[in-house]
From Swiss-Prot:
This is UPF0065 protein in clcB-clcD intergenic region. The keyword Signal applies. It comes from the Bacteria. CDD domains: PBP2_Bug_TTT. SUPFAM superfamilies: Periplasmic binding protein-like II (SSF53850).
């Protein structure tokens, strides 16, 4: 006869086996219901546009609806926290960017440690940003704008989508390299920030090409330079800031990645990564992204993890050295 200890061991092993079978089954059956992508910024920005382009195609690949839901606020913290609290079952995902690498510096009381709370799935796209000013701005080029800023510390204001967002950090890096003091005005997303820029309430903004190209082409804002080392195909004739602002090697590319709660099964992550890479390889998606100034990326979940770690190091040094988390440059 089995001893009580042996019986307990058999029961325990049986429970473990059943739990493993449950995980395997959930991964094998995944997805069996609609999937939510949480975008922690308002509609209309680059991250929202990229998400909607890809969600439709991924929905077709997975055979389940993929809906994009906007949860803006606190530089992406509110939406990210919602995903961090969600079940790790692959049905609530996060689309985020540089903010996920710098939250801890700007929001020390945030309810999650991003690197522990989330697992990377795939890099979706990268987009250069563009320095823009209101259409009636006296500044015709980046050099004159920065020269005025240097002579008048704190009088040139710049908008961002929130503290720690990629467009905040891009402008802050430009200011740091140029040795100028700018006044940061954070918003709850790039869309309301752009509206105030167009209205002339702000001096400048470094925003994604995706969000700004229609305003540039309609003459509502003036583009002074792009943050890529080469001219952007979607904005021919606009020089790189490395040249236009006399800042050699200045380059900032906004990236967008797909993430899941960290406890999510690796098998589910693999399903999502495969579907995302298939979507990003289609000519339709590549053209749709190119039309809004973005470049399709893809790759392994591990590659996104490496990028994420590099961004934590890169921006952490800038934030600490220039005290950006106190809203000072």
């Amino acid at each position: 006869m089995l001893s009580r200890l042996s019986i307990r061991l058999v029961v325990w092993l049986g429970c473990v086996g059943l739990s493993l079978l449950a995980v395997t089954a959930s991964a094998a059956d995944y997805p069996s219901k609609p999937i939510r992508w949480i975008v922690p910024f308002p509609p209309g920005g680059a991250i929202d546009m990229v998400s909607r382009v890809l969600a439709q195609r991924v929905s077709e690949t997975l055979g389940q609806p993929v809906t994009v839901e906007n949860r803006p606020g606190s530089g992406g913290i509110i939406g990210s926290a919602e995903v961090a609290r969600s079940p790790a079952d692959g049905y609530t995902l996060l689309v985020n960017s540089t903010g996920l690498a710098v939250d801890k510096w700007f929001y020390p009381n945030v309810a999650y440690d991003a690197r522990k709370a989330f697992a990377p799935v795939a890099l979706l796209a990268t987009i250069p940003s563009v320095l823009v000013v209101p259409a009636d701005s006296p500044y015709k080029d980046a050099r004159s704008l920065l020269a005025y800023a240097k002579a008048n510390p704190g009088k040139v204001s710049f908008a961002s989508a929130g503290m720690g967002t990629s467009i905040h950090l891009a402008a802050a890096l430009l200011a740091a390299q140029a040795g100028v003091d700018l006044l940061h005005v954070p918003y709850k997303g790039s869309t309301p920030a752009a509206a105030d820029l167009i209205a002339g309430r702000l001096s400048m903004m470094v925003d994604s090409i995706t969000a700004q190209q229609s305003f540039i082409k309609s003459g509502r804002v003036r583009a002074l330079g792009v943050t890529s080392l080469q001219p952007a195909p979607s904005l021919p004739g606009i020089p790189p800031l490395a040249q236009a602002a006399d800042q050699p090697n200045f380059e900032v590319l906004t990236w967008f990645g797909l993430f899941v709660p960290s406890r999510t099964s690796p098998d589910i992550v693999k399903v999502l990564n495969t579907a995302m890479n298939e979507a990003l390889k289609t000519p339709e998606v590549q053209k749709a992204l190119a039309d809004i100034g973005a470049s399709a990326q893809g790759g392994t979940s591990q590659a996104l993890g490496v990028l994420w770690d590099n961004e934590i190091d890169r921006w952490g040094q800038l934030i600490v050295h220039h005290r950006l988390n106190t809203n000072e440059l």
